[in-house]
Amino acid sequence: QFSADSVFHWARSSAWCDSTHVLHYQISTPQGRKFVSYDADKDEMKTYDSQKTMEKALGIKPRPAYKPQFGRRHERHWMEVDEEKEAYPVLSPDGKMEAYIEGYNVVVHEAGKPYTEAKRILTQDGTIGCYYSNRIQWSPDGKYIFVCKRVPVEKRYAYYVESSPADQLQPILHKQEYAKPGDALPQHYPVIIDVTTGKKVEADKHQIENQYELEWMQWTPDSKEVTMEYNQRGHHLYQMLAMNAETGKLRTVVEERANTFVNYGRLWRQFIKDGKQLLWMSERDNWNHLYLYDVQKSKVIRQITKGDWFVRGIQRVDEENGEIYFSASGVNRNEDPYLVHYYKIGIDGKNMVALTPEEGNHSAQYTYDYRYLLDTYSKVDAAPVTVLRDAQTGKLVK
């Protein structure tokens, strides 16, 4: 079993200094730890007698100490569902107006003026059983507001007893919000409001019925549409939808269907070309791969990665040079298929480069500009090895 304290002479706690090609790390030895920095551009290495000395020499600001909060008044269960009712204001792009929820409805107000003055109520149909969510989004041009009507449901709880609390003799009954199979879930129905005229358009509820989630709302740069992702309960259907700001009509940009379930936790997306194209990750061919979409035509332009292997994650999309940096497993046939390697590939699906070719499970740290790559790799039967690579070619630098 690997133990970081019993394996010596490997780089640990490594990191790049901000906006530089200077690396700092520690080396464990039988005599203690060594503190080292390395300038990749100058091929210059320096050692220090302590962590504090190294941080001072390199201008590294020490991390603030974590201060845990104790006592029951600080407790909060992470499974509590946000009711989206808090009335905090959302500023318009030009900073002149702010929108917020008041009495279940959407209100706009001139920024900087008293809240009793210069406000305009944009909606009047919000109720306790179907109110406007506080997750308000202004369009980039400030003309529209996107918001959802939220239909809440009765909260369901799981109860458990803390039999021996540390600060009292009596047991404590806890409850945790927990929706069980078949329980009703909150529903969200999109609305777009013209701030000047007050005209509002609503999406067709039948296109987004039986929601598990409706999330990832985002305006397009031209303020013509709002994209969102609809996860139907049961996870057999997952769609990226686009809502027209003038008509409220929903159209499907991307659709994922599965007889078993769509692994929505693996999905990843990024708009490029000013929102005209979309990078999308999907398991639709039974392997997790990247696809390029034409957003307006709702069509796949190409599958970027393909094969009997799977993409693990995306580190960077270099739109200027048309490249994607990603991690993957299973590319090398004669290896354990779960070992992680790092690659780059063109958005055109060509010129895939293995940046970490050695057999092993790799962990990569790139410089801010992706000029260098610090690569640490190991296996269950091999101690960690750390090398410096050219992040464009994968060639060893040191």
Set out the residue ranges of the language-model regions.
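Beta-propeller domains
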Residues: 153, 157, 165-300, 312
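Beta-strand-rich domains and repeat architectures in extracellular enzymes and scaffolds
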Residues: 2-33, 85-91, 213-215
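Short loop/turn segments that connect beta-strands within beta-propeller blades
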Residues: 40-41, 111-114, 195-198, 245-248, ...
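Predominantly five- to eight-bladed beta-propeller fold
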Residues: 41-78, 119-137, 147-205, 394-398
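Short glycine-/Asp-/Thr-/Trp-enriched loop segments that recur within the blades
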Residues: 4-8, 56-61, 82-83, 126-133, ...
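Residue-level detector of Asp-centered blade-edge/turn motifs that repeat once per structural unit
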Residues: 18-19, 93-94, 140-141, 221-222, ...
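A short beta-strand motif characteristic of beta-propeller blades
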Residues: 2-4, 76-79, 120, 124, ...
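Beta-strand C-termini and the immediately following turn/loop, strongest in propeller blades
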Residues: 24-29, 95-104, 110-111, 146-152, ...
